[in-house]
Design a protein with these regions (language model features):
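Conserved active-site segment immediately N-terminal to the catalytic lysine
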Residues: 177-189
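Conserved PLP-binding catalytic core of the aspartate aminotransferase-like
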Residues: 290-322
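PLP-dependent enzyme catalytic core of the Aspartate aminotransferase-like
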Residues: 333, 337-398
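Conserved beta-loop-alpha segment that forms the PLP phosphate-binding cup at the N-terminus of a helix
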Residues: 53-82, 86, 90-93
């Protein structure tokens, strides 16, 4: 029987067909006027996609590479930093900061939850040089209130730099960047609908000034080199030219979502993720399943607890073997306990209805229990119908 492979993971995500075509067709050398023009357009468009006037960098790297750069460029060994950690990727910030000799203090929250601002307030002392946090903790499906965190950090003065990993946040959540966030990081394989291999960030003037005095070793991820090259429409080292061409196509697609306005297109993309998230949560609850981050759900993905007595790996295998659907397991301490369905980037409402219909079949097979077929799809359809009738899609916790 024919079975297509479909990605429902929070990265990589499905690739935009126009981006596939652009990547296949582009074969220009990176030290040419053609590529400089392309790269300059991408940098300018990313400003609108992020929502910033800050300088933007694009590097051939995973998102973790630019996360590392946000530590090595902004700290020196011995600096005191705060890491807000509520999952696998918060733990990664702590590991990176320790690798560069920082004195790390952690503001923690349980997996699937978000932070108490009072905990951050108590630890945000004047000697803290930087705060590192995720916008969306994709290992748990939780979304953190970056605006509230940023206002608290900025309210403590100019000494503390705020760095936000928004790799699954950009394109799924609205951010107020300028004046609040010093470094915000994104990745190509998320809402931007192209393969892994590019990471990007916007950097404030405060952060650029900090780099003049920090002493951590850096070479490939020296942001100052990248900024100097970007001013010429280049990268300091060989860029991933085909991926840049794909990124340009994806940004143009988003612009057309907004009828020629990229900022409006970004808003449409975010609304699309919000709607899919609401549909997915309603569908899961329609089957009696428990959401993992119910108080702070992300728009990028939905984390769902495996039914009692069922290991989530069995659910994931059944999704793949029966339908060709690739769904993500939990990570860290939640591996085997939950599964994650993504809906950021190149997903639409039909994708959402399809994965929920598949979920009904998967649960019946894996648990051996009676499933009311249509329950998940019906619940999601009701959300979709309300949206089509003009009801606003309420934003989940930001």
């Amino acid at each position: 029987m024919l079975r297509k492979t479909r990605l429902f993971t929070p990265g990589p995500t499905p690739i935009l067909p126009a981006a596939q075509t652009a990547m296949a067709a582009y074969a220009m050398h990176h030290r040419t006027a053609d590529f400089r023009g392309l790269f300059s357009r991408v940098l300018a468009d990313l400003k609108d996609f992020i929502g910033t006037n800050h300088d933007v960098l694009v590097l051939a790297s995973s998102g973790t590479g630019v996360m590392e750069g946000a530590v090595s460029n902004l700290t020196s060994a011995g600096d005191k930093v705060l890491v807000l950690s509520a999952g696998k990727f918060g733990e990664r910030w702590a590991d990176l900061a320790k690798a560069f000799g920082c004195s790390v203090e952690i503001v923690s929250a349980p997996y699937g939850e978000t932070f108490e601002l009072d905990d951050l307030r108590q630890k945000l002392r004047p000697e803290v040089s930087a705060v590192y946090v995720q916008a969306t903790e994709s290992s748990t499906g939780a979304r953190h209130d970056i605006q509230a965190i940023a206002q608290l950090v900025r309210g403590r003065g100019d000494n503390t730099i705020l760095v936000v990993d928004a790799i699954t946040g950009l394109g799924t959540t609205h951010f107020g960047v300028d004046g609040l966030i010093d470094v915000i990081i994104g990745g190509s394989q998320k809402a931007l609908m192209i393969p892994p291999g590019l990471a990007y960030c916007a950097i404030s003037e405060r952060a650029w000034k900090r780099m003049e005095t920090t002493r951590s070793p850096r070479y490939y991820f020296d942001f100052r080199k990248a900024r100097k090259a970007a001013a010429r429409g280049e990268s300091p080292y060989t860029p991933a030219t085909s991926l840049v061409a794909g990124l340009a196509a994806a940004l143009e697609f988003i612009r057309q979502m907004g009828d020629g306005d990229l900022i409006r297109g970004r808003q449409e993309l975010i609304e699309n993720a919000e709607l899919a998230a609401r549909m997915t949560r309603a569908g899961a609850e329609g089957l009696g399943l428990r959401l993992f981050a119910p108080s702070c759900p992300a728009a990028a993905l939905t984390a769902i607890q495996a039914p009692s007595g069922t290991e989530s790996g069995a659910i994931i295998r059944e999704f793949h073997d029966r339908f060709g659907a690739v769904v993500a397991n939990g990570q860290g301490e939640m591996k085997g306990k939950l599964f994650r369905i993504a809906h950021l980037g190149y997903y639409d409402s039909l994708d959402t209805l399809a994965i929920l219909a598949a979920l009904e079949q998967v649960l019946a097979q894996v648990t051996g229990r009676a499933v009311k077929y249509g329950a998940a799809v019906r619940a999601a359809q009701e959300v979709y119908s309300q949206y089509r009738q003009g009801a606003n899609v309420p934003a989940t916790a930001r």
